[in-house]
Amino acid sequence: MNHPSELKYARTHEWVKIEGDLVITGITDHAQDELGDLVYVETPEVGSQVTAGEQARVVESVKTASDIHAPVSGTVVEVNTDLEDDPDFVNEDPYGKGWIYKIKPDNIADVEKLLTNAEYEAGL
């Protein structure tokens, strides 16, 4: 499994990358591998509030549907509209083309409360 060291991780299998005053998030390589081929990614609405640890949306695969949780609290400022036509980007490149949404966090310091890649991998 690939879990880049420059990212932070939630126990619920989401990753976070800081980009200026925003955070980009998606599901981890482990999560996409467990789900199998994704067929649908439901993204949150731009402008909606998300709360850390709570369900933000759902991904559906040929095997099952799974909740996506918000890794930090904040406002959704952008979603990856490419996933509407190509949800398999999450399987092919979960940390690149497969990002799901961007959040303007209520407190950027909350990212530091998330797991390192070593801590995340130890919990798998």
From Swiss-Prot:
- Residue stretches making up the Lipoyl-binding domain: 22-104
Q: Give one Pfam hit by family name.
A: GCV_H
Biological function: The glycine cleavage system catalyzes the degradation of glycine. The H protein shuttles the methylamine group of glycine from the P protein to the T protein.
Output this protein's name.
Answer: Glycine cleavage system H protein
The record's similarity note reads: Belongs to the GcvH family.
- Organism of provenance: Acinetobacter baumannii (strain SDF)
Its gene? gcvH
Subunit structure comment from the entry? The glycine cleavage system is composed of four proteins: P, T, L and H.
How the cofactor is bound: the record states: Binds 1 lipoyl cofactor covalently.
Q: Which InterPro entries match?
A: 2-oxoA_DH_lipoyl-BS, Biotin_lipoyl, GCV_H, GCV_H/Fam206, GCV_H_sub, Single_hybrid_motif
